[in-house]
Swiss-Prot record:
PROSITE patterns tied to this protein: FKBP_PPIASE
Domain observations: Consists of 3 domains; the N-terminus binds the ribosome, the middle domain has PPIase activity, while the C-terminus has intrinsic chaperone activity on its own.
InterPro entries: PPIase_dom_sf, PPIase_FKBP_dom, Trig_fac, Trigger_fac_C, Trigger_fac_C_sf, Trigger_fac_ribosome-bd_bac, Trigger_fac_ribosome-bd_sf, Trigger_fact/SurA_dom_sf
Family in the record: Belongs to the FKBP-type PPIase family. Tig subfamily.
Protein name in the entry: Trigger factor
Lineage: Bacteria, Pseudomonadati, Pseudomonadota, Betaproteobacteria, Neisseriales
Record keywords: Cell cycle, Cell division, Chaperone, Cytoplasm, Isomerase, Rotamase
Organism the protein comes from: Neisseria meningitidis serogroup B (strain ATCC BAA-335 / MC58)
EC nos: 5.2.1.8
Amino acid sequence: MMSVTVETLENLERKVVLSLPWSEINAETDKKLKQTQRRAKIDGFRPGKAPLKMIAQMYGASAQNDVINELVQRRFYDVAVAQELKVAGFPRFEGVEEQDDKESFKVAAIFEVFPEVVIGDLSAQEVEKVTASVGDAEVDQTVEILRKQRTRFNHVEREARNGDRVIIDFEGKIDGEPFAGGASKNYAFVLGASQMLPEFEAGVVGMKAGESKDVTVNFPEDYHGKDVAGKTAVFTITLNNVSEATLPEVDADFAKALGIADGDVAKMREEVQKNVSREVERRVNEQTKESVMNALLKAVELKAPVALVNEEAARLANEMKQNFVNQGMADAANLDLPLDMFKEQAERRVSLGLILAKLVDENKLEPTEEQIKAVVANFAESYEDPQEVIDWYYADPSRLQAPTSLAVESNVVDFVLGKAKVNEKALSFDEVMGAQA
């Protein structure tokens, strides 16, 4: 193979000029045309018997284009291997204006290479390790939430109070005119749950079934309905029904409803503590991991390959569209989401992927089979039949990709925590459970 020069363009972009001998192009084109001849069905000739000259006239140009494309791809691969180029993404090929060599056809390949990743001094980085505990008070709080989730509403003949579920008819007008979305029949909501604007709810409190009244409501300037934002409406409200909330007692029936077969309340509390502890642990680990990843990004000066960032942005866009489809938005698959929306997140992911790969390779942080099994077991623990979930993961090796990635990340977090300056941060139960995770 003739030597080629790799030209450095901007940042990670490189360029090589590939020379394809016309003798090779012509030979490969002839071979392709002969293959086409054997398959061709042309009027006036038996299948495969049309003259090669006719085949060349009909298919010669497209055959030559196919050959050039194939040779370019092959030659670029050979050059990348010979030059030990770590190509990121796919190259783009461009014609070369100066075709000064009549013996060959020249094509320029423009591509990006992976950046050199140099891990900085991790001991200079500060990392926040988040901690939280789950005790009796947190179990009590969770049990109370579970009680509220099983609230029963019973009809009462009295005025409406906060906490009641009410059913109303309402019609709103702005400057005496009805507006879109301003009216409804038999609309149910819970007073005090912030489902309606505060002035609207306050107007219903104290009403009895069968009563009607006008309530003035000022829509906030930042209200999601732009047509009514900042305007004042008068709602005519008729109260149809009032129901009082009743919470279940924490007894054997309640425990059975939560899956404790014998109705043992103590067992139920143990199960609640175990489940809540698992969720709290997951959330604090996520926050610690986020701090570790931020520290790694600070420790490494890195320019992510544009091609990989674009690929990741496209993947994130498709992921969002699929989520919309799964939520019932059938037309979401055709949404044209601008990739710029995802560029920042994509660049972060690509950069972290490169950093983690380097860190894992340099420090032998690949997870063991036991670590992967532990992650799978942790996934399975929250299901009714954990062994069925474990068997599902191990039935197809591709399903182990997610547990393996989590095990890798866990090893990286432990490694960085052992190197960096660690500041422990204790969070309350409410702070942990209120965090996005």
